[in-house]
């Protein structure tokens, strides 16, 4: 098919501008983030070392590999989450019946005695391994470790939460989340995935993702807000499902990861709004939906990235207007749950302003 020269020139100019945006804005963000991660991980490693001395069941899994710290997720430029993997989940059954969207429970296997578990004192009368009880114990240990740390003058525990959050140098907030890795099984609530008859992702990658599995995190969930006491008590024992590694594996190939880096940079520069209605994780999920709409690798080459970003922002506007953003793997889970309607409304207007600029101004990336 013949393409008009002026159209080719416009696309070439757009690619040039996006490459420049990546060099000047995205790389700067990545460098700043990497510097922050190195700084906070050095401090957190010291604290976790002390925790392990006090309680050997909490073994630090925060290790540097090829210059990167594994298990660190960037929530925003100044907010991070570090996952601490726990051992010996084996005597528990994974129960995922959809009662709590985005959550599951760990129940003592039939015929297994409590004494067979490494986590015996955190098992409830009903035989559930309590996420909340483990977190409470871990929080106490981290608070004690902070008091003993050589970094104690620059680290404070964040109060008014059951989660383990540290404020470092008054600049960064780091959440340390105990977790179990669940390999070789796949949750029933994500059984619909992958969508049948779509060419993406390739069956080999699907098999890889399902073998790798998912994580169960000990953290608070907004799902149970305004629920009755019994449900809230059950929620305290429940674990939050996380597909962090699976998501990252799916975004390999083409310019998908580059697209995510650009979206995160645009979010930090233009969509960092009061109430945090739009997070980098929302954009990551919408990017995965966009991968289904555009399953071929050639649709993710550098000449198509602008179209993909526009498509993701149009999806985002629709989600903000309907006040619902379904999780990619767990569509019953609304990621806007707990966000104020006014914050979502203001966010929709801001995303539309940004999208309109991208759609109507051929030189938009020069200013963004």
UniProtKB/Swiss-Prot annotation:
GO terms for biological process: eye development. InterPro entries: Mab-21-like_nuc_Trfase, Mab-21_HhH/H2TH-like, MAB21L/cGLR. Disulfide bonds: none annotated. SMART domains: Mab-21. GO terms for cellular component: cytoplasm; nucleus. Belongs to the mab-21 family. This is Protein mab-21-like. It comes from Drosophila melanogaster. The lineage of its organism: Eukaryota, Metazoa, Ecdysozoa, Arthropoda, Hexapoda.
């Amino acid at each position: 098919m013949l393409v008009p020269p002026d159209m080719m020139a416009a696309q070439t100019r757009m690619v040039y501008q996006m490459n420049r945006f990546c060099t000047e804005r995205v790389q700067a963000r990545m460098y700043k983030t990497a510097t922050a991660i190195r700084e906070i991980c050095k401090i957190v490693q010291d604290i976790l070392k002390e925790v392990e001395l006090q309680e050997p069941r909490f073994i630090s899994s925060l290790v540097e590999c090829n210059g990167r710290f594994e298990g660190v997720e960037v929530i925003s430029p100044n907010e991070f989450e570090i996952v601490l993997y726990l051992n010996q989940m084996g005597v528990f059954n994974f129960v995922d019946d959809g009662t709590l969207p985005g959550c599951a429970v760990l129940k003592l296997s039939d015929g297994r005695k409590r004494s067979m578990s490494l986590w015996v004192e955190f098992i409830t009368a009903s035989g559930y391994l309590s996420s909340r009880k483990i977190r409470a114990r871990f929080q106490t240990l981290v608070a004690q470790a902070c008091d003993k740390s050589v970094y104690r003058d620059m680290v404070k525990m964040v109060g008014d939460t059951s989660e383990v959050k540290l404020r470092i140098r008054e600049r960064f907030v780091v959440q340390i989340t105990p977790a179990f890795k669940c390999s070789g099984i796949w949750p029933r609530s994500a059984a619909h995935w992958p969508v049948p008859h779509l060419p993406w992702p390739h069956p080999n990658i699907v098999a890889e993702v399902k073998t790798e599995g998912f994580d169960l995190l000990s953290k608070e969930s907004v799902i149970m807000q305004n629920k009755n006491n019994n449900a809230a008590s059950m929620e305290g024992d429940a674990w939050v499902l996380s597909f962090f590694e699976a998501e990252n594996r799916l975004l390999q190939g083409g310019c998908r990861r580059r697209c995510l880096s650009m979206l995160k940079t645009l979010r930090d520069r233009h969509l960092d709004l009061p109430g945090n209605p739009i997070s980098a994780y929302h954009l990551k999920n919408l990017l995965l939906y966009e991968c289904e709409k555009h399953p071929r690798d050639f649709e993710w080459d550098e000449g198509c990235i602008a179209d993909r970003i526009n498509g993701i922002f149009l999806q985002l506007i629709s989600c903000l207007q309907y006040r619902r953003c379904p999780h990619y793997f767990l569509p019953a889970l609304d990621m806007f749950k707990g966000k104020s309607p006014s914050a979502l409304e203001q966010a929709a207007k801001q995303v539309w302003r940004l999208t309109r600029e991208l759609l109507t101004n051929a030189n938009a990336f020069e200013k963004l």
